[in-house]
Amino acid sequence: VCVKQVPDTNEVKIDPVRGTLIREGVPSILNPDDANALEAALRLKDRDRSTQVVVLTMGPPQATYMLRECLAMGADEAYLLSDRAFGGADTCATSTTLAAGIRKVSDVDVIFAGRQAIDGDTAQVGPQIAQRLGIPVVTYVQDIQMEDGSITVQRQMEDGYEVVEVQMPCLLTCVKELNEPRYMSVGRIVEAYQKKITVWDHMAVDLDPKDCGLNASPTQVFRSFTPPQKGKGEMLAGSVGEMAHLLVEKLNEKHLI
């Protein structure tokens, strides 16, 4: 399961001068869609106890807190890809690094990922990982039925859903409608802090520094900004004729007519 530690967007603010995110003092959380992806994997484990659930992330050393949350939910192993060489990565470079980590884990039947991360909203990393690994991908998954060697899923569409059968190994990106992530028990939280988290740098996953991080990122963020607030709405009262007259006056004031 590919997971990501993200800033809580309810607390995020933009530096008005530099146009960048102010991350200092902002709490970090497990990306919500990734929690649904992890729950999907854990439910497969609930049905078949021989299933091993592994969580993988790329990030700073502090991401171990998020990984321990995943372990407390029920994941068996956790891997952190952490290296200064990975810094400044766009989705292209991020997918390269995560794919390298997945190859290092090896013997993976299904890769789960959230539909998108709330700090980027691109929904690109999951499909890019699948492309780099040469496996099929199904996005916007809202239901999963697993059989021998294949998986049948419902793929969320704007006007309904699409039923897709896909062979394993494959990658599925999950939406929040798929499930309700489970809570962590006190016992599992204690166990999670007793488990080892494996940390890999670029050498451990056989990546050249020029092929990851900022060096391998064809896209870069030019500026982040908060859209200007829209004007407040105003309720008009009176008869139809009076309201029509007031509306015309308001539109004239704004030079809209």
Question: Can you name each region flagged by the protein language model?
Answer:
Residues 2-257:
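N-terminal glycine-rich FAD/FM-binding segment characteristic of electron-transfer flavoproteins
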